[in-house]
Amino acid sequence: MWGSRAQQSGPDRGGACLLAAFLLCFSLLHAQDYTPSQTPPPTSNTSLKPRGRVQKELCGKTKFQGKIYGGQIAKAERWPWQASLIFRGRHICGAVLIDKTWLLSAAHCFQRSLTPSDYRILLGYNQLSNPSNYSRQMTVNKVILHEDYSKLSRLEKNIVLIQLHHPVIYSTHIFPACVPDGTTKVSPNNLCWISGWGMLSADKFLQAPFPLLDAEVSLIDEEECTTFFQTPEVSITEYDVIKDDVLCAGDLTNQKSSCRGDSGGPLVCFLNSFWYVVGLANWNGACLEPIHSPNIFTKVSYFSDWIKQKKANTPAADVSSAPLEEMASSLRGWGNYSAGITLKPRISTTLLSSQALLLQSIWLRIL
């Protein structure tokens, strides 16, 4: 995570992530019991619509509510839904807990394998190499990619549901974010944050103890967002990067951005006293300093019906045959498995559409 004022969600302070990429180059791409207020998320508001049965579930509460003013170091319980997706022992992406057995992440984080046993989910971590008594390492029972997601066009329908073998126990360190429904509207003045364990620069990994970083960002409307991803040779009509299933957010003034290794992590907004996961880190323009473009996030509300349907139609894991819960491990390396998708807008080196497709196909073969 790159940014001049990005904060660590833990005792150490950190920088932020930076990714360099050419247009259409896809880089190697991720207790103590706690009972919060029993008040369910609100039923109606000008910006938040009723959420049906999901409303009845506890979600979106932390010890820290409302705005946290400049420079304050966040504590470990700040983002209790934040998860790390581990692939064969290395952090590759972020993920977000949405109930006791389900998480959301980006589909492109699973491009190397769809075998659940290849993955682990870390929850309750603030520093990946320094698990606490609240940290949990969870095994994965099922990986459900969106049916319309394609490796050949990894910008669309970039969402995945992850089912755990064992339900988590909620605590101040592990708690789900609320999932918005399809009618949820978030205004630009809402408080929104991104978080993750992404890279500090194009060639600099986050160093031990691998602290969680976060940054406040603003939502950007679609019309303004499209202007950041236009070049003389590739118009928005030829390559429509801003689809209905994504949203745009960032902070170009303070140079805050999510990048490689942050993919699949949450963009959360504070709506009527609850934190909602409104986006999942999807892709971004090159965030070489100075950052010239915002980040693009999978719009969670667009997929709310899909999420409900898949959860309802998927049987619970057979606990009797599930592996035992594992001891929370200490991450020793960040590694080159980390996932991310970058597009670089407004570049001096131009690519025609046919060249871009060729370049994309070459990268796909070597990933």
UniProtKB/Swiss-Prot annotation:
Species in which this protein is naturally found: Mus musculus
Cystine crosslinks: 93-109, 192-269, 225-248, 259-287
Protein name: Inactive serine protease 39
GO cellular component: acrosomal vesicle; extracellular region
Protein localization: Cytoplasmic vesicle, Secretory vesicle, Acrosome; Secreted
Similarity remark: Belongs to the peptidase S1 family.
Residue stretches in coiled coil: none
Organ and tissue specificity: Expressed in testis. More specifically, abundantly expressed in the haploid round spermatid.
Entries under InterPro entries matching the protein: Peptidase_S1_PA, Peptidase_S1_PA_chymotrypsin, Peptidase_S1A, Trypsin_dom, TRYPSIN_HIS, TRYPSIN_SER
Upper classification of the organism: Eukaryota, Metazoa, Chordata, Craniata, Vertebrata
Signal peptide from the UniProt entry: 1-31
One protein family per Pfam: Trypsin
Main location: cytoplasm
